[in-house]
Amino acid sequence: GGLARLEKIIKQHEPNYVLLELGGNDALRGYPPKKISSNLVDMINIIEISNANIFLMQIRIPPNYGSRYRKAFESIYPRITETTSAILIPFMLEEVALNADLMLPDGIHPKETAQPLIAEFMYLQLKPLLTESN
């Protein structure tokens, strides 16, 4: 879905910054990590044409997907940032996901009470990068 919509959105909004936080749902559906990686790289290529600064968020998936798939999936994010202009941002739910009180019963999505923690985390991650690029 994201790849199909991205070019139109980039042309419409002409952003200076783009944060890609995608791939998790594809992983939860068991899509091949190589395909997810290819889609993310295609998206980054579209964004690079617009000269926007690109941040790519590391995505993690639950351990019940098996260590082999999990490692293959989670390793695509650092690899992509080694070969593109995207800057890797740590997974925003790293601390939140470990606290059941902050997560919905599905164990994947955060509760409303987690939002201030996520906002603070994102602020701390992005502020130095935004300041650096201005």
Regions found by a protein language model. Give the residues of each.
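Alpha-helical cap/lid subdomain in secreted, periplasmic
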Residues: 4-134
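N-terminal beta-loop-helix "entrance" segment that forms/cooperates
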Residues: 1
